[in-house]
Every structure is written in C-alpha cells, then in structure tokens.
Swiss-Prot record:
Required for the export of heme to the periplasm for the biogenesis of c-type cytochromes. Keywords: Cell inner membrane, Cell membrane, Cytochrome c-type biogenesis, Membrane, Transmembrane, Transmembrane helix, Transport. GO terms for molecular function: heme binding; heme transmembrane transporter activity. Pfam families: Cytochrom_C_asm (PF01578). Signal peptide: none annotated. It comes from the Bacteria. It is a multi-pass membrane protein. GO terms for biological process: cytochrome complex assembly. It is found in: Cell inner membrane. The chain crosses the membrane at residues 24-44, 64-84, 94-114, 129-149, 160-180, 197-217. GO terms for cellular component: plasma membrane. Belongs to the CcmC/CycZ/HelC family. It comes from Haemophilus influenzae (strain ATCC 51907 / DSM 11121 / KW20 / Rd). The gene is ccmC. This is Heme exporter protein C.
Length: 246
C-alpha cells in the first residue's frame, strides 16, 4: 500500500525535493510578511485603548502561535521516529528545534515590549508568560541534550523522548488564561463567535500568521537539508554532490 512512498524515503530524494520547495516558501514568506507587516504597521488603524503600541502584535502573536506549533510538530516527528524507527524524522525534529527556540524568544521579547506600556512592567510571573518561558528552556534543553552525545542517534532519541514527555506544556500555555486569573488577554481570533479584533487589524494579522508559518517551513527545509548532509556525510550521494559543487 505504501510502496509508492519508498522512493521518497531516500535521503538524496528528500534533499532534492527540499531544495525545490525552498524557493517557493521563501517567496511566500517574503510576500506574506512583507504585506502583512507593512499593512499592520503603517495602515491598520490605531487601537482605541492601546493606541499604536498594539502594532507589535503583528510579530508577537504569530511567533507565540508558532512557538507552540513547532513544538507540537517536533513531538509528532519524535513519535514517528521512535515508533516506526524512521531516522529522518529525528533529523526533522532537530531541524525544527532552533526555529522554535527563535520564535519563542521573539514572542517573549515582543511580549515584554508590549507589556511595558500596558502593564507598567517588562515582566510579571503570569501563568502564560511563565509557561512560555518554560517552553523556551525546553527548546534549549532539547538542543543541549542532542549535542551532549557523541552518537547522534542516541542524542536524537534522548531529545525525542524529552520532547514527547514535555509536550503537555502546550495545552497549559493555551488554556492558561482560562484556568488561572492572568494579566494576559484571551484569544482574539480563535473564538467560535465573532473575533474581538476589528477587520482592518485582523487581515494583516492573519497574513503575518501565515507568513511566519511559511517562514517556519522554509527554514525547516533549509535546516533539514543540512542535517541530511551531516548524517550522510560519508555516503556516495553526498560525495557526488560535493564533487558537482567544486
């Protein structure tokens, strides 16, 4: 049934496919983020309560969303690698980790910048903020654990187990504003009822959310190719590729 997938399981085939897809996602990222951020910063109306300080939302909200999305994707890849013994899934997980760490860092920094005029302080030990900070440390822990072993396979398995066992942090982050009395506002665009954000503000936000998604995919494709080269450095296909680049 799955025989048609076998040719695509070869590292050299995956390397080539990722190379072909990368320019597409780079272009989509440029268009979506270019339009979304310019629209949000320059043309979206000021908020009636927050004034222009709300505009940092166009970076903060997408990076916060995908900081969780990347970790969830890593956990899925880790399960695939451990259950079905697919080595490339571990490579994909490791390829995503620095991107997720970057998104989490950006969400924390932009959140602090946004929080200063709104809350009067750069940081509070709010449930959502604290959980997001823990997520950042989990990303760093996965990268550190992977690098701690001389055997890349053992390091990848250890990092995968850590990712799977800590993925529970994601519902804690998402539902923290409902479970605890927090300063952080609730969802603005994921509600079943009418979104609590004006359409002229909402459209560029959606563009930025999809823009950061394509950025995540693009960077993952680039990093996954690098991981494939490192993993198969002594394989004939990598040596042949090196010869063509000389």
């Amino acid at each position: 049934m799955w025989k048609w997938l076998h040719p695509y399981a070869k590292p050299e085939t995956q390397y080539r496919i990722c190379g072909k897809l990368s320019p597409l996602f780079a272009f989509l990222t440029l268009v979506l983020l270019g339009v979304g951020i310019v629209w949000g910063l320059a043309f979206a109306p000021a908020d009636y309560q927050q004034g222009n300080s709300f505009r940092i939302m166009y970076v903060h909200a997408p990076t916060a969303i995908w900081s969780m999305g990347v970790y969830g994707s890593m956990a899925i890849a880790a399960v695939v690698a451990l259950v079905w013994q697919i080595k490339q899934a571990h490579l994909a997980m490791i390829a995503m980790a620095p991107i997720g760490a970057l998104f989490t860092f950006l969400s924390l920094v932009t959140g602090a910048i946004w929080g200063k005029p709104m809350w009067g302080t750069w940081w509070v030990w709010d449930a959502r903020l604290t959980a997001e900070l823990i997520l950042f440390f989990l990303y760093l822990g996965i990268l550190a654990l992977y690098s701690a072993f001389s055997d890349r396979n053992i390091g990848a398995k250890a990092a995968g187990i850590l990712c799977i066992t800590t993925v529970v942090i994601l519902p804690i982050i998402h539902f923290s504003v409902e479970w605890w009395n927090t300063l952080h506002q609730g969802a603005s665009i994921t509600k079943l009822e009418k979104p609590s954000i004006a359409i002229p503000m909402l459209v560029p936000l959606i563009l930025c959310i999809f823009g950061f998604l394509t950025l995540y995919i693009w960077l993952t494709l680039v990093r996954y190719r690098m991981e494939l080269l490192k993993e198969d450095a002594k394989r004939p296909w990598v040596k042949a590729l090196a010869q063509t680049l000389k």
